[in-house]
Amino acid sequence: MLNFYMLSSGSRGNSTVIWDENDLIIIDCGISLKKFQEKTSELGIENLEKSMFISHEHSDHSSGVRAISRKLQADVYSRGKTLEKMHLEKGYSIRGEVAIGNFTVMPVSVDHDAVDPVVYVIGNRGIKISVVSDLGIISQELLDAMQGSDIMAIEANHDPEMLRTGPYTEMLKMRIRSEHGHLSNEQSAEAIYVSASDNTRIVLTHLSEKNNTPDIAIETVKAYLYNRNKKYASMETASQDFGSTLYRL
């Protein structure tokens, strides 16, 4: 059985755990050791081999890496430049797919204002999970890599109108809207339309607390897909405090 659980999602911290009977894959670690332990205490993952994959160096994805990897004795993987930026001497620099037990973890380069950012597409015995956030545009390479995901955890960061009228400075608004920023709800919907299948479970992630709401994100994406007769298995938003549903595949 393959398990997926997003522990936390948003500008104050991101972390996702995916595991089978032997191995635990951690995607990003932007939360504290205490919160990680609280969120995972009843998952039964203590005795699994643990590996951590970091998408980029921003603190909401990496602040807990040192403490948590040390406590769990987890190997850390990321792009070489990202490891350097995080001052992690013991991490493993990756370019292509990494095989760990029954898992494959494929990094896909994305556009974001970090040194060498990636997202991850995870495979395990025919099951595919895509964990995609912190990017301003979606490339054809990424659309192809996500194709037919069983779980698609994808950024729906902002509603453009809320961003336009919101409290951020114009410079920050421009950064968020740029090709190196974050996906809007409609950009997320466009990617889902192209890459999801009828059986895809959709998790909308990294929602801005100031420029989006769960209801607006869900309504925007659902309306886009409904108007194009696009089917999918389920849809939810992941939150900062409660994460996502625990999925067992």
What are these regions (language model features)?
Residues 76-127:
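Metallo-beta-lactamase
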Residues 8-9, 29-31, 57, 81, ...:
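Active-site metal-binding loops of divalent metal-dependent hydrolases
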Residues 32-78:
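Active-site metal-binding motif and surrounding structural segment of the metallo-beta-lactamase
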Residues 6-15, 57-65, 105-107:
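Structured catalytic core of nucleotide-sugar glycosyltransferases
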Residues 3, 101, 123, 227-249:
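Binuclear metal-dependent phosphoesterase catalytic core
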Residues 140-239:
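Cap/insert and terminal regions of metallo-dependent hydrolase folds
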Residues 1-41, 47, 118-134, 151:
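Conserved beta-strand hairpin/beta-sheet module of binuclear metal-dependent hydrolase folds
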Residues 22, 47-49, 73, 126, ...:
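A general structural motif
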